[in-house]
Amino acid sequence: MSSCGACTCGAAAARLLTTSLTSAQRGISCGRIHVPVLGRLGTTLDAQALRRAPLRTFSETPAYFASKDGANKDGSGDGNKKSVTEGSSKKSGSGNSGKGGNQLRCPKCGDLCTHVETFVSSTRFVKCEKCHHFFVVLSEADSKKSIIKEPESAAEAVKLAFQQKPPPPPKKIYNYLDKYVVGQSFAKKVLSVAVYNHYKRIYNNIPANLRQQAEAEKQTSLTPRELEIRRREDEYRFTKLLQIAGISPHGNALGASMQQQVNQQMPQEKRGGEVLDSSQDDIKLEKSNILLLGPTGSGKTLLAQTLAKCLDVPFAICDCTTLTQAGYVGEDIESVIAKLLQDANYNVEKAQQGIVFLDEVDKIGSVPGIHQLRDVGGEGVQQGLLKLLEGTIVNVPEKNSRKLRGETVQVDTTNVLFVASGAFNGLDRIISRRKNEKYLGFGTPSNLGKGRRAAAAADLANRSGESNTHQDIEEKDRLLRHVEARDLIEFGMIPEFVGRLPVVVPLHSLDEKTLVQILTEPRNAVIPQYQALFSMDKCELNVTEDALKAIARLALERKTGARGLRSIMEKLLLEPMFEVPNSDIVCVEVDKEVVEGKKEPGYIRAPSKESSEEEYDSGVEEDGWPRQADAANS
């Protein structure tokens, strides 16, 4: 051992060294020297002195201690975390025996601890005279700096939230969607039930690990001494203790050992013969992904946007038109989960319980043709989404990190619910061909499917011809209600992709009555939006009932659904929105003839200042005649 001339810790180190064991892993460092507290003893110690020395161990952990090799010298296997507890007084004395106002108790035996005399004004070393253990005391100020509140796991958070505030029932979600979306009652019921079951699946699947851990702890056999140690540990614990891995001021060596102990305490999954011998097993609820299909402007995206506002889980809306296969220019498939992680504020545990809405999924349908060697934006994207829909671990780039650095976060999509939607233009023609197939000789069908583009072209050609709009809508809705998986496969979706979307929900087209309701009834309706625009210029907008029906008929003829309403309103109100600002117009009236283009919108103007002054003067003169008559009579 090297000597220290002016250092005050030399005597303390020498005293500790004389009462040590024959091996240890650490030492006391001070200034210019490093004195091993429990080092391998050579010939420097007398053998008789070593036999007379009591059995002691030393721990440098601020809030825990760990015996050497994780076990006591009596073989009781006490490698758990311990703390030095304080008595009634908060202020710790320096160099006192601990019998006054400051009382530090040993976490192993509960006996009083005494401070080690080191000729220093303040010491953090205490020892227990009964079990001969040394400890490092962490002050209250240091504990506030070092002890950080450990975030509870996502499973505990979900379980606690489920107990305190149960998930909204499907009827409540349905009523909320009804305030913003008109019609589509079947689709709203399916989404409401799917969201509610998603909450229940999270509550059922994730806390199962906690229950298994509790059962494993109960089955662990403990000796009476270990039970006594645990009882005293709970009795004298004075603060919440922190997992020491990675934050110990003395390094990560002790933290690594603690992490290994935690990993050993985690319940292990049953393997091999244990699965065969087990008599019962927990039911794991699997997810049912949803596919929404319907004409454009029927409310598919609006349903998703409205649903995202009322959920307590992360919700991400992703556009499939920009996705490409890995290695090509465009967005990677992992960007779908990256958006979900961003919505969860980069909380991985929370993102693994979210909902992903895949919009425009029909645009990734494969296009048949021998001229195309590789469909990177169609079938390649579907193949990349297969494991994502079923459940896999996705490597998502970290926040503020480039892709080339390789800094990724692993996200498990097993409990992520996927809702896909698409217009699927021409799908009704494919269903019609399937239902009206005519067979030639040897069972060969006369009308073979030609894929997505041929079906869409046939549907567009049918729209261009003159036909009854109401009959076309009814026929299309009737056919979509009979959609099957083989129709989607003929459209261009691969069978593996269709099989991972078991719930298929067709949305019906919007009729005239529904379009009139969309104009006025929802909270974010079209007519109230334009009325708010005119009210900013201190002007009113009045639209008659006949005008609303005429606007709905125009939208039906355009066959663009509810999106056609806004374009019609923009065209009708272009001139009024140009004339009203900085004018005397106080009201704009729109009737049926204005919608049909037979006349211009009507304006109601405020009276000018000169006319109002003349009317006021004439009114004063008229009021003056009775006064003069009364004065004359009096």
Curated annotation (Swiss-Prot):
One of its GO terms (biological process) is ATP metabolic process. The modification N6-acetyllysine is found at residue 438. Its EC number is 3.6.4.10. The modification Phosphoserine is found at residue 618. ATP binds at residues 295-302. One of its GO terms (molecular function) is ATP binding. GO terms for cellular component: cytosol; endopeptidase Clp complex; mitochondrial endopeptidase Clp complex; mitochondrial inner membrane; mitochondrial matrix; mitochondrial nucleoid; mitochondrion; nucleoplasm. Residues 94-147 form the ClpX-type ZB domain. Residues 70-84, 599-611 have a biased composition (Basic and acidic residues). It catalyses: ATP + H2O = ADP + phosphate + H(+). Detected in liver (at protein level). SMART domains: AAA, ClpB_D2-small. SUPFAM superfamilies: P-loop containing nucleoside triphosphate hydrolases. Residues 69-102, 599-634 are annotated as: Disordered. Residues 612-623 have a biased composition (Acidic residues). Belongs to the ClpX chaperone family. ATP-dependent chaperone that functions as an unfoldase. As part of the ClpXP protease complex, it recognizes specific protein substrates, unfolds them using energy derived from ATP hydrolysis, and then translocates them to the proteolytic subunit (CLPP) of the ClpXP complex for degradation. Thanks to its chaperone activity, it also functions in the incorporation of the pyridoxal phosphate cofactor into 5-aminolevulinate synthase, thereby activating 5-aminolevulinate (ALA) synthesis, the first step in heme biosynthesis. This is ATP-dependent clpX-like chaperone, mitochondrial. It comes from Mus musculus.
